[in-house]
């Protein structure tokens, strides 16, 4: 997202790095614009217009509970616009706890501490904090039908915590059910979503089992998910949902998606919007002003003054807006067009005479719209 190197570039580290350059007030101004522009009504309309029906929305616990047993409405102020747009365009929202108190893994996206510990599993206070935060969220949205469900914990990962992970989920579900009996609860396995040891049999009547999938070709995926389907969905009569898959070619995306659809497995592509990527629906460019910050953070440039740093941040936030982004049409069609695997389509309308960019080749699967001797990377990670 930031396209720069800062050691363990978690949310907190990035906030500290930005505040160091521009101060607290300008940091807040930047993040306000960043959040406002990252997803807008135009984004949601595009999603709906292209036959997608849900958005998985990553949350940080601090936006709802900045301190233990202290609750905030800041997160709802951000989400309520999404809820309104979701209702307007028939797009469901899945709320996903991407960063939990103490962190649920050692990765930057969980906002773990610099020592890389996942202290959600070692602190009962953090576990109670997570459960109370979910109760706060569930109570606020208990009667909102556009909220499809609550993804309780994104990609937990720590050795030897099968029993603890189940206890955490049970605490969260008990807290949610005290105020909300309507919404689905979604649980991911250990080791970044895929090890569900100790999480059976189901312990809520409205539970969904979720996985994440990035590694493996189409044939490998079919073998793996047939095992999941037979061993989980059919045995326990519960739905499966792939909360993340992505970071690969359009042909790979289409093949995996079609397999999931044939087997009644719900899915969500990751990521929605990224910096200069062809593997997200939207891509935004690095501005010249923001590049100076990247150079500085990467050790390849001088420290910008406050005005220069703030200008770089604001230019980055503006580039996030729908009107400034590039739409990755090929990926959009790979995920939404049912004829993608069998029929090529023009990238866009062209009226001669004029300039026809060579990169605007027809969209469609490999061997349908084009030929590439390596149209997927099964060992992406």
Model-predicted segments: where are they?
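Extracellular glycoside hydrolase catalytic/binding regions
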Residues: 128-274, 279-291
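Short, polar loop/linker segments at the starts of domains and inter-domain junctions
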Residues: 2-13, 224-227, 369-381
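Active-site mouth of glycoside hydrolases
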Residues: 1-184, 189-196
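Extracytoplasmic
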Residues: 327-381
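Coil residues (strongly favoring Ser/Thr
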Residues: 41-44, 81, 175, 221, ...
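Glycan-binding loop/region signatures in secreted carbohydrate-active enzymes
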Residues: 1-36, 204, 210, 215, ...
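Extended, alpha-helix-rich binding/interface surfaces that flank or overlap catalytic cores
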Residues: 266-349
């Amino acid at each position: 997202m930031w396209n720069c190197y800062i050691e363990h570039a978690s949310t907190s580290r990035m906030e500290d790095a930005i505040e160091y350059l521009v101060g607290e007030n300008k940091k807040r101004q930047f993040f306000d614009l960043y959040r406002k522009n990252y997803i807008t009504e135009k984004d949601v309309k595009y999603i709906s217009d292209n036959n997608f029906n849900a958005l998985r929305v990553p949350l940080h616990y601090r936006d709802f509970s900045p301190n233990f047993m202290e609750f905030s409405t800041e997160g709802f102020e951000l989400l309520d616009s999404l809820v309104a747009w979701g209702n307007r365009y028939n797009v469901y929202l899945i709320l996903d706890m991407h960063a939990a108190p103490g962190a649920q893994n050692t990765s930057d996206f969980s906002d773990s501490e610099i020592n890389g510990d996942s202290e959600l599993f070692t602190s009962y206070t953090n576990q109670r904090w997570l459960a109370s935060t979910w109760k706060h969220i569930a109570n606020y949205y208990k009667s909102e039908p556009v909220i499809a469900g609550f993804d309780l914990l994104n990609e937990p990962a720590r050795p030897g915590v099968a029993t603890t992970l189940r206890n955490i989920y049970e605490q969260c579900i008990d807290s949610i059910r005290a105020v909300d009996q309507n919404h689905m609860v979604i649980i991911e396995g250990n080791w970044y979503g895929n090890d569900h040891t100790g999480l059976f049999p189901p312990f809520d009547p409205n539970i969904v089992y979720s996985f994440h999938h990035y590694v493996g070709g189409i044939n490998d995926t079919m073998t793996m998910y047939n095992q999941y389907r037979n061993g989980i969905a059919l045995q326990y009569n519960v739905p499966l949902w792939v909360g993340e898959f992505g970071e690969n070619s359009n042909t790979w995306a289409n093949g995996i998606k079609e397999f999931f659809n044939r087997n009644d497995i719900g899915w969500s592509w990751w990521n929605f919007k990224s910096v200069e990527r062809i593997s997200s629906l939207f891509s935004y460019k690095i501005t010249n002003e923001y590049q100076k910050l990247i150079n500085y953070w990467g050790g390849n440039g001088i420290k910008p003054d406050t005005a220069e740093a703030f200008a770089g941040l604001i230019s980055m936030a503006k580039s996030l807006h729908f009107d400034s982004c590039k739409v990755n049409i090929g990926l959009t069609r790979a995920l939404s067009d049912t004829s993608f695997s069998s029929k090529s389509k023009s990238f866009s309308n062209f009226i001669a005479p004029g300039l026809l960019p060579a990169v605007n080749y027809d969209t469609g699967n490999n061997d349908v719209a084009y030929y590439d001797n390596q149209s997927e990377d099964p060992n992406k990670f």
